[in-house]
A protein has these predicted regions:
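N-terminal non-catalytic cap/leader segment that marks the start of a structured domain
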Residues: 1-142
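Glycine-enriched loop-and-adjacent helix/strand subsegments that border the catalytic/binding cleft
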Residues: 105-214
């Protein structure tokens, strides 16, 4: 399942929302719960849907030990709504949006990031960096940089070039999103704490970096 956040053109003034990418479109799980509750005639369908499946991915991760179950339920409701031709709420808000559209653009995947660690490199990369001789300390624990968790931007957003650098570089990296909190996690239990994976462009000022870390 591919999860994203997107800007909803019909809910202006509200933050980007949780979406599921499927079959060339963005499905909004929260809105599909709204449509389901409206169909059932339940009171306060929008509020009920926000409790069941929040429009914020970070909120879902903080509330549920198994967040995928809630998202998958909303996805299943969306497929049913599409099958019966129910494509919007009673207020006229669509349940489905075109992918890669200027009207409903994808943003950064998480709305609230509490901690970001940029790990040094893979073993193969480390061998090249240390010219074949990796220090034993490298194997004793993960080596990482403490990065700012407030400087994430989204798909197709503009990367601003700081005036202090003349050598701005980027690296495509694998991002691991932690869903379930923990401490002193054993290797065989690690996957239970991983919510998903994403692709990150790590932007570096190489000339500044060289001065700070020769």
């Amino acid at each position: 399942m591919k999860i994203c956040r997107y800007k909803n053109p019909h809910l202006k003034g509200l933050p980007p929302r949780l979406g599921v990418i499927y079959n060339g479109q963005i499905i909004d799980p929260h809105l599909n719960f709204v449509a389901e509750y409206e169909r059932e005639g339940l009171f306060n369908p929008w509020e009920r849907a926000e409790v069941k499946c929040p429009s914020s991915l970070s909120k879902i991760l903080s509330l549920y030990e198994k967040p995928f179950e809630t998202i998958e339920e909303g996805f299943a409701i969306a497929l049913f709504n599409e099958k019966i031709g129910e494509l919007e709420t009673t207020q006229g808000v669509p349940l489905f949006y075109p992918l890669d559209s200027d009207t409903s653009p994808i943003t950064s995947p998480l709305d609230s990031i509490h901690s970001f660690r940029d790990f040094f490199c893979y073993e193969g990369h480390a061998k090249k960096a240390f010219k074949g001789s990796i220090p034993k300390e490298w194997y004793q624990g993960p080596t990482y940089f403490r990065q700012s968790h407030q400087n994430f931007i989204g798909h197709k957003d503009t990367i601003f070039w700081p005036s202090l650098t003349k050598k701005l570089d980027f690296e495509a990296e694998l991002g691991v999103v932690i869903g379930l909190e923990g401490r002193n996690i054993k290797e065989h239990n690690a996957k239970n704490h991983i919510f998903g994976f994403t692709i990150i462009n790590d932007i570096s000022a190489r000339d500044i970096q060289k001065k700070e870390w020769p």
